[in-house]
Structures are given as structure tokens and as C-alpha cells.
Amino acid sequence: MKRVWLWGAVLGASALLNGCTSDTDNDGGTPPPAHQEGYADPDGVILLNQGARMSENGSISYLAPDGSIEKDVYRTVNGSAFGNEAMDLDMCNGKIYIMSNNLYRPNNEAGDGCLVVADAETFRREKVFTADDLTFPRPEGSLEEQEMLPLLTPLENIAVMDEHNIFFSDSQGLFRLDGTTGELNIVKGSYAFGNQGATIETVVSTRGMTVIGDHLYCAGGGFWSETKLFEFTRGSDEVTRELPLKGEFISGICRTGDHELLVATCGRSGSTKSYLTYVDTDSWSITLERPLNADISAEFMNSSGVTLAGDYLYFAAGSLTVSRLSLKTWEVEEYIHVTDDAPEARYLTCNVVADPERQLLYVSVSNELGEAIVSDGNILVYDCSGEEPVLKNNLVNRGSYPVNIYPVSRFYR
């Protein structure tokens, strides 16, 4: 799906397959109980609706464990919109962090901010950062004149270790925000000097960035840089370790163990020259590398191009056909033809998302696509535990251009 009003020519970004560390030996506050209630129930699902930015603000839909769905959760609780053109969210230590570009005021309604922090159980707003709040010191080597530089939209992805270590990205690079002081710094080595922050491909891509303990992992690559896996550390504004990878672009990252990642890389859109690489994060070594003759591109979407459930890796490469790869036999098969269940669908709004705990697959589609068009759409929920997919739920017009879907259980890993 070519979402030109969102991305322009930028190809960086990520669905979030990350868990928040439970380490309490920091000033990030006391973590809540392992499992929470309300909207933080691990059996629930959060839908982040980007919305048609010229006609509506972003919103939250919540799919409850009993299968019922609640629309516009944040507005119901707070009486306002969290932001315009929602991009990503994360949950950590009982807080929800919602990120938006927040450039437009549809129907003359301003969103609360670019980054909104809310209570995870209630969605009650607690803290807001506007674009004016989020400026960072000019990096060494930059040709910009001003000492403090603004973020560039689109914003991309967010991963939170604690309130002192909020990592997020835009097309310039990766940033670390201390949510208690508002201090924002760009991570050294991630700034795109190639074209002063307006590169065709960002050096560090945060699509699929993953937190394990005190470390954050994301990959990078593109036209001007070698493809690598990067490690960042709590409290640090520098890259800790780098590991070279095969492939040109980043599709996504899946966490496959306590200290193991599966990194998916690919060629240009439409290319079937892809790679899957297993990495041991303790030894910082590649344990398995397999070429894959399939298009696993994440396209222009802000979520991971691959998603894992059981022994299968699922992907759609921006199409309305969901394929899966067996990690046992390494065979690829077409698994779901979306138009069989949503005949009017024409566009994927985000990459497919799996819930590995319940063996469910979420596919979000729309009938139209436009920054001012509020389109009909479907969120299809499939049981993928068997050889054939089983449609469990078809949610019609319960979201608006969902930019990502978050089974809440992923935040408790």
C-alpha cells in the first residue's frame, strides 16, 4: 500500500514486538503487578487508528477478551483526541505511550500532543509532550544553524524501557527521551548526515525494534549503509554493538527467545531476495542464516513486515494475500486470500499481526485510501493454529486506518 501522504520517500520505521523490562534498579518507578486489569488486560487487543488526517484525528479501539469492541476509548475517558495521524504506541510499567505526528486540526480540533502518556488500565491522560517540547541539541557535524533542532514528521516508532528511557524515531534517526525532565537526545550514530535528516533511507530503521532487559535492538540499512543489527543500552545515547547482516532493507524483527532474535531483511519492494537471520544477543553471533525466495517487504507501513506465531512466520508484503513460512520445513504457502472474507477490501492498512499466545492473526483492510477519506474497513481475526485458517471475527467499521494492532500480551513478555 503506497501511503504517500504519510511517508513521502521515507522507508524507515516498526511494529512493535517489544516487551518492557521489569528491572526495578533504576529511577523508572516501581513496576505494577505482572498482569494488570482494565485496558491493560493481557487478553485484550488495542487498535491504534491513524485516521484520515485531514478529516479526523487518531483514535483507540479496544477489543475486549470477551470479543466485544469499544471505539474511541481515549476520547471517552479524556474528552479529547490524543493526536492527529497516530503512528505507534507502547506500554511499560503501567503506562501507555501514544505517538502522533499531530500536524493538522480536522474540524478545528487540536490533538493533545505528539507524545501522550496515559494510565494503561484506564487510558486517563497523565502527561503530554508537544512538538515544541521535543527539540534536541544539534548533532556534531550538522550544518543546521540553530542549536536546538525540531523533530521531522513522520514520526515512526516507539519503545519504552522506563520513563527515563523512551526511545523513538523520525526520519532523522533514533532518539532517547527522559520523560521526567523532557531532555531529548539523538542517539549517536543514528543521525542521517547523507542529506541532513531528509535521506531516502534512514540509517537506523526502527521497524520491529525490540527490548530485551536493559537493551534495545533494531536494524538498519539502505542505499548508503551496510545492513546491520544494532544494540542500544538503557541510559546511553550511543550504539553499544553492531552486527553485519545480509539483505538491503529491514522488514522486521521477531523475538524468538530470552536472548534470541529473528531478523528479516529483504530487497526492494517486489523483490524475492530475502534473508532470515537468527541472532544470539548474549554471544552477539549469528546462529542461523537462511535465504528466502519470497517478498517479505514491509512496504511503506509503520509496522513489522513479518510476524510470528508457533512454527510459522506470516507476511503479506502490502498485498491482500497473507503467506506463511514454516520454520521447520522452510516452505512458503499462500494462507489467506483476504477478499474471500472482505470482498470490497482494496488496501492493507498495516502489516498483519499475530498473537502467538492465542494463535490468532489480525488483518486490517480498507475499501478506500486517502488523507481526507473516512473509509469503510474490516479487521479480520483468524485462528491460525491449524492447517487452514478459520475466520473467528469480522469487525466492520470498528476502526479507521489502523496503523498497528497490539495484542496486549506482547507487552508482558
Which ranges hold each PLM region?
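Repeated scaffold domains used in trafficking and secretory/extracellular systems
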Residues: P32-H35, A81-M91, T135-M161, N195-T210, ...
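Bacterial Sec-dependent N-terminal signal peptides
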Residues: M1-V45, S236
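Post-signal peptide N-terminal segment of secreted/secretory-pathway proteins
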Residues: Q50-E156, M161-E163
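Structural motif
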Residues: M54-S61, P106-V116, G173-D178, W224-E231, ...
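A short beta-strand motif characteristic of beta-propeller blades
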Residues: I69-A81, R124-L149, E183-I200, D237-P244, ...
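Acidic, serine/threonine- and glycine-rich low-complexity intrinsically disordered segments
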Residues: T180-L320
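Short loop/turn segments that connect beta-strands within beta-propeller blades
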Residues: A64-G67, D119-F123, D178-G182, F232-D237, ...
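Blade-level signature of beta-propeller repeat domains, shared across WD40, Kelch, NHL, RCC1
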Residues: V374-R413
